[in-house]
Amino acid sequence: MNKIAIFGANGRMGRVLIEAIDQSQNATLNAAFVRASSSMMGVDVGELAGIGQRGLTVTDANSADFSQIDIVIDFTLPEALEANLALCVQQKKPVVIGTTGLNQQQKDALQRASQHIPIVFAANYSIGVNLLLNLARQTARVMGGTADIEIIEGHHRFKKDAPSGTAVAIGEVIADELGRDLSTCAVYGREGDTGERDQQTIGFATVRAGDIVGEHTALFADIGERIELTHKASSRLTFANGAVKAAVWLKNKSPGLYDMQDVLGLA
């Protein structure tokens, strides 16, 4: 059985991860971490996730016994990433990271840590989204030379970053396939007199409303026809189950930086 620990157990994804691991046939939850100052310290993980007591209490990572942990899953905030990575490197534990909205310094820290431990880092752990990424690359290969490309994403009102990490990941695979640099060809939102559309650009549009779990569309529009690749998530368990799958896959892997395309054999 694969023994998993969670960073950010009291967050929205942390609570769903507790439920996903509880339902898993291949993994068990051995530790759940929150900040030492959190009011959730000492709470039973099952109560935290709303699934009834499980006999494991929430604790602080710095005082934990990592000898009983095989893999760590981190869905916290960007500002917590570097400290969490340092602890995983110190303890020599593989880590699955789902934190999005990273700046360049945090991405560099991820690269450095991957020289010492195996890491899976993905903007989205849904199997369907990763199939969408694969299909977007194929569509860009065939239609990208002439089609206008737009990426539309929607999430709940509480999401703090925009566009979503998944939307950016879709843009990156399309830009890579077309030999473009997303940092120079991306257009984020439009307003006022924008002039005619530059066919070399990749447009992004963002919706933040209600309790939308996650919706992404890659639109390839040519004259006379268009293709829309859409994924809609109806439950966060979709992402949590994918992260648990990645954690099980990551155990005993060599140091390096992997993604869900590797986990699913799509790379």
Curated annotation (Swiss-Prot):
UniProt keyword annotation of Transmembrane present: no
Subcellular localization(s) per the UniProt record: Cytoplasm
EC number(s) on file: 1.17.1.8
Sorted UniProt keywords: Amino-acid biosynthesis, Cytoplasm, Diaminopimelate biosynthesis, Lysine biosynthesis, NAD, NADP, Oxidoreductase
Top enzyme category: oxidoreductase
Location, primary (coarse class): cytoplasm
Entries under PANTHER family matching the protein: 4-HYDROXY-TETRAHYDRODIPICOLINATE REDUCTASE 1, CHLOROPLASTIC-RELATED, DIHYDRODIPICOLINATE REDUCTASE
Name of the protein in its database record: 4-hydroxy-tetrahydrodipicolinate reductase
Organism of origin: Pseudoalteromonas atlantica (strain T6c / ATCC BAA-1087)
